């Protein structure tokens, strides 16, 4: 897996779409109900669009009503790093890829059991590696 730091800014701008760059590198937020995965029900693994790290399983995805893909748990304890975000006059928990530092979205304490957490992610920060049907 490649880390963000191994890419120059010019390389990141070339390999990411403008929206992916704005979200992952500038802590942007896509508009609600517009991202590719907000209403996606396909099975698979959601990976970081920058470094391809596995972040979330579709098994932990749920409909939060927020308009963004929401998950109650990451695939492992060390794949998503949580940081304090004080932008826009709020105190929130920013979720970033622990491997490459890409901004993914935010974590809120209003999710379902068993964790009570809602990882509210930007579709632009992820790609879905769909499960393949077994023959």
Task: Report the location of each language-model feature.
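A short Gly-Trp-Pro
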Residues: 3-135
């Amino acid at each position: 897996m490649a880390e963000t730091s191994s890419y120059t800014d010019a390389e990141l701008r070339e390999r990411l779409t403008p929206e992916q760059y704005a979200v992952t590198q500038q802590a942007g937020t896509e508009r609600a109900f517009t991202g590719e995965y907000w209403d996606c029900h396909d099975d698979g693994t959601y990976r970081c669009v920058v470094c391809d790290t596995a972040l979330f399983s579709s098994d932990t995805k749920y409909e939060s009503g927020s308009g963004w893909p929401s998950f109650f748990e990451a695939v492992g304890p060390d794949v998503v790093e949580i940081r304090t975000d004080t932008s826009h006059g709020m105190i929130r928990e920013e979720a970033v890829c622990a491997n490459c530092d890409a901004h993914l979205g935010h974590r809120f304490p209003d999710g379902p059991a068993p964790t009570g957490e809602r990882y509210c992610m930007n579709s632009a920060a992820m790609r879905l590696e769909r499960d393949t049907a077994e023959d």
